[in-house]
Every structure is written in C-alpha cells, then in structure tokens.
Regions:
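Substrate-access "cap/lid" subdomains that shape
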Residues: 217, 243-246, 251, 260-261, ...
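Bacterial N-terminal signal peptides
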Residues: 23-34
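Alpha/beta-hydrolase fold nucleophile elbow
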Residues: 223-234
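N-terminal secretory signal peptides that target proteins for export/translocation
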Residues: 1-17
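Non-catalytic accessory segments of hydrolases
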Residues: 2, 38-202, 479-499, 509-516, ...
C-alpha cells in the first residue's frame, strides 16, 4: 500500500473515531439535559435557567426570582491559589439547586473559604404561569439591563450576601452580585509567583472581570442583555469600578459605571505614585509590606511559590494590613488610574459618581467612640489630628478645623477626614472624568440616616450624619448596619425611591433622568453643580467646594 493511501486510511479512521466520540458525547449531553429537564419539572414551578455549566434551579420571593451560589470559576485552591481564575466545569448531575449563597471569600474573623467564587442572579417576577419552559422563553424575550454589584470592605472584608436588590429588580433590571478574592489571597505580588509567567498580583480584579465574562456568556438565559451591563459598587467596590474603567482588559464588558464613595485620598495617592507589581514585590508601599517581607513573615524564608501555597489561608489573613490596593501590573492596569482618567485612556462610558456628606464620621466612631475613647478635649483632638494627618499637615488642619468651631471633637475630626480623604479627592476625579464622558455627580446628604445616635446606648458623642456606607440601606433594604435596626421614615422612603429610580434608569439608558424625578444634569466644572440626595427629594446644589474646603486647602496637595 502506498504511503498516501495509508495516510488517507488513517485520516478516515480518525474521522470515523471523531464522529463516534462526538456522537457518544452528544448522547451523554442529551441524557444529562433530559435528566436535568426532569429534575426541573419535578421542582414545581421554580425558576430555571440553562447555563454553560448546566441547569440552575432558583427560587421565587415577593421581590422576584433569585438564583444563588452559582460558581462562576473553578475554586482557586491548591495549585490555583494566586493564579488567574479558570473556567468552572459542569455541575454534578448537570443541575444546581441555586437556593443558598456560596461561601464568602477568606477574611478576618475566621470568615469564609478559599472556595468562594460564586455569584447570584436576581430577576424580576415573570408574568407567565404556563410552566418553566414558557417562563424561560419569556425571560429570553425581555433583554433586560443588568446591574453588576461589586461589594466593598477595603478589599479585605465583605461578600455578596448582605445585599438584597429587591427594590432595584422591581424596576425591571437584573442584578448580579458576586464574591471576589480578598486580602493577600486576592492582592499579592511576590517574585516566585510572578516567575511562573502568568498575570499576577490583582487576582481580585481578575475575578471581577471573570465574573463579568460569565455574565456576558450566560445572562441572556436569565432574560438579561449582555450588551447592557452597568457595573456599580461602594467603597472598595467603588474603587474597583474605577479600576475596571481604567483596565484595557475590561473593554466592552460594560456600558455604564456607578461609583459610590470610591475615590479616597489613599487610593488616589497609591495610583498617582505608581506602585507597580515589581515595586510591590521588592519594596512594598507606605502601607503594605513587600511581597518578600510578607513571605518571610508567614514562614516562607525560601520565597518559593510552593511554600506560599502551603501556608494556611488564616495565616495569610493574619498578616494583612487594612486596607489593600491593587497594583499597576502592566496588563490589567497599564498605568495609574489618575493617569488613565487624565489622558482619557479609559473605558469611556457614562458614569455616576458621588460621596456622602459626613463620610469620615463612621471611622471616627469606630476608632474612638465605640471603643470607649471619645475625643472630648482640645488636647485629645490635637492628638487625633496628628494621628490622622501627621506632624506636617496637623497645624494647618487644626487652623482650618478648630476644636472650638464644632460641638465636639469627633465632629471636627470627621469634618477634616471627610474633606481630605473623600470629598475633595472625589471632586478631582469627577472633574477629570467629566471632560471625557457624561458624569453625573451626587452627594448623599441625609443627616438623619439610620441608625440614630441613641441606638448606640450612649457610646456615640456625636451624630453619624450621612456617614460612609449610609446610602446602601436606601438601595438595598434591610442591609445590616452595625447590627442595629435601620427602618426608614416616610421621607427617607421617598429619597430611596428617587435613588432607585436614578440608578435603574441609568442602567437602562445611560442617563439617570426620568419623568418622575428632579432633573439631574451631567457635571460641569464651570457650574460645579451636583445632585444633593436629601429627603424627601433630591435637589441641585453648587456649594460643594465651600462645604468641603477643597480649592481653599485640599486641592493644593
């Protein structure tokens, strides 16, 4: 037999074998689908969706349908610790009973697990009562906008579990919440791991992008439009929103962005001073030790990746400072966020961005009052200002925010902290973004946001006002704030309704305005106007600079 004939025979045999294997695989998949369908039929009229990993069977509440604890990536454990997220395979039996939240990611307090890359999908109620197949088709017809929530917690704490998006979902949007790697398991640069040749350092940001990729591939099966995704987040989640705006790898993944309290001084300083992965590995930053020092502190003097991957997660957590920040790694983040915004080299989509009027009062309460050490005297105030701002800045801060001008020292420290850490840095970001994209700016300003001062049993010496994270309970009802009741008054409910309308209308159109709420115009540096979110109804104001000492003091730094 000639060589060419032998080759043809081999090719034909391979083709036959491939067809047999493909046929067997198809039969197997068909069998799994049949079993999954039977399982779904046996689940009464519970909502279902068919994803790339198999069938998910959710549950229905008064607020809509929910699909909880869906794995969006392989568990990042063992050899996958400190690697980019990998695709999850198939659900066992091709079916997932998606009725419970997945584990939070490992964090202080013994909370969570490394097997934590789960997401949750919340959809509006489906009107059809003709069985799961009709409901599934009904979802496909809708093409609803998708809101992708990134939780806060300093990149150290937090999870998707506390956020009930019922109010948002009732406005005909789909909400996705998820977990991403935190602490040194999510943000860690070390030379041996870098030497493995994969993208490294910003694992938490990689998880966020991987979850966005899952949404793009699967959300249509829940009734969502993969081309109408808005990312939104608060605090470190808002910071992550800015990081994704600046990331070339996130291009095309979303068409709108909302950052709540996401721009703060340490974050800006970190990015404007360009802490690269290489620097993080060898020298670290003012607030975070180098990767080499961290490895040594957890017992890996050999500096090997195998040693580090064998370190218990709890040991890594114990070594963490608070908060953490991402790195400029040359791929996911190719430049500082400040440079990206200033140059216009970012993902150019409409933005909502804002802060709360009394952001820093929360941190004063946590650091002083709630640990039994309130700032009561002028001397105690001077010491607290030096601790916050250092010896160089303390004298001008004390002159601009004198103890005698405030009812008590906690409020005075809260004022300088709010202006210097949150409000003025945020306005600088607003000004940069607004030169390139429509940027809708706000200040949440409900001075009576729950919980009330009286709820703390006399520990608080000042009202919290519109503190950091206070706005969350107006978007996510029932969220746990200090473990205390957070019932909204009738006027606060009106403000909540307006905020939910703005946020969801923005997700639908890229513009927060609708006929039922006060007009919200894009930010212009010439007018410096912003939307003041006050009860019962938002109002346009232009006194941000005078309220927060920005151009007179903080902008000079």
């Amino acid at each position: 037999m000639k060589n060419s004939e032998k080759a043809n025979k081999r090719l034909d045999h391979c083709g036959f074998t491939s067809r047999v294997l493909f046929g067997a695989a198809a039969i197997g998949v068909f069998t799994l689908i049949s079993l999954a369908t039977a399982s779904a039929d046996n689940s009464s009229h519970r909502p279902i969706a068919f994803t790339e990993s198999g069938l998910v069977i959710g549950s229905t509440t008064d607020g809509g349908n929910q699909f909880l604890g869906i794995p969006y990536a392989a568990p990042p454990v063992g050899a996958l610790r400190w690697t980019a997220p990998k695709r999850y395979g198939f659900f066992p039996g091709f079916v997932l009973q998606a009725t419970q939240f997945g584990s939070a990611c490992t964090q202080p307090g013994g909370i969570g697990s490394e097997n934590c890359l789960f997401l949750n999908v919340f959809t509006p109620p489906v009107k059809s009562d003709d069985g799961w197949r009709d409901r599934d088709r009904d979802r496909d017809r809708h093409g609803l906008p998708v809101m992708f929530w990134i939780h806060g917690g300093g990149l150290i704490n937090g999870s998707s579990t506390p956020y009930n998006p019922e109010l948002l979902v009732k406005k005909d949007v789909i909400v996705v919440t998820f977990n991403y790697r935190l602490g040194f398991l999510g943000f860690f640069a070390q030379s041996a791991i870098d030497g493995e040749g994969h993208l490294n350092g910003n694992y938490g940001l990689m998880d966020q992008q991987f979850a966005l990729g899952w949404v793009r591939r699967n959300i249509a099966r829940f009734g969502g439009d993969p081309d109408r995704v808005t990312i939104f987040g608060e605090s470190a989640g808002g910071q992550s929103v800015y990081a994704q705006l600046a990331s070339p790898l996130a291009s095309g993944m979303f068409r709108g962005a909302i950052s709540e309290s996401g721009s703060y001084a340490e974050f800006q300083d970190y990015f404007f001073n360009v802490v690269t992965v290489a620097q993080a590995e060898t020298t670290g930053s003012p607030s975070v030790p180098s990767g080499a020092a961290i490895a040594e502190s957890v017992g890996c003097t050999s500096q090997t990746a195998s040693c580090l991957r064998a370190v218990p997660a709890s040991t890594m957590v114990a070594a963490e400072p608070f908060p953490l920040y991402p790195f400029v790694d040359g791929t996911l983040l190719t430049q500082t966020i400040g440079a990206a915004f200033a140059s216009g080299e970012f993902n150019q989509v409409p933005v909502i961005a804002g802060t709360n009027h009394d952001e820093y009062r929360l941190f004063v309460a946590l650091d002083y009052d709630l640990v039994g050490n309130p700032i009561l005297t002028s001397a105690e105030y001077d010491t607290a200002v030096q601790a916050l701002w250092g010896t160089t800045l303390a004298p001008p801060v004390l002159a601009l925010y004198p103890f005698a001008a405030y009812p008590i020292g906690g409020e005075a420290l809260g004022a300088s902290g709010t202006d210097g850490v949150f409000s003025c840095p945020a306005r600088n970001v607003d000004q940069a973004l607004s030169k390139v994209v429509p940027t809708y700016t706000y200040e949440f300003n409900d001075e009576n946001a729950p919980p009330a001062q009286s709820a703390f049993g006399g520990l608080l010496t000042f009202p919290l006002g519109a503190y950091h994270s206070a706005e969350l309970q107006y978007l996510f009802p029932g969220i746990d704030v200090f473990g205390l009741p957070t019932t909204l008054s009738s006027q606060q409910i009106q403000l909540s309704d307006a905020m939910v309308s703005y946020w969801t209308q923005f997700a639908k159109t890229g513009d927060p305005n609708s006929s039922g709420e006060p007009l919200w115009s894009p930010y212009s540096e010439s007018t410096d106007e912003f939307q003041s979110l006050i009860p019962p109804a938002p109002a346009v104001e232009s006194n941000f600079d005078s309220s927060h000492q920005c151009s007179t003091f903080w902008d000079t730094f």
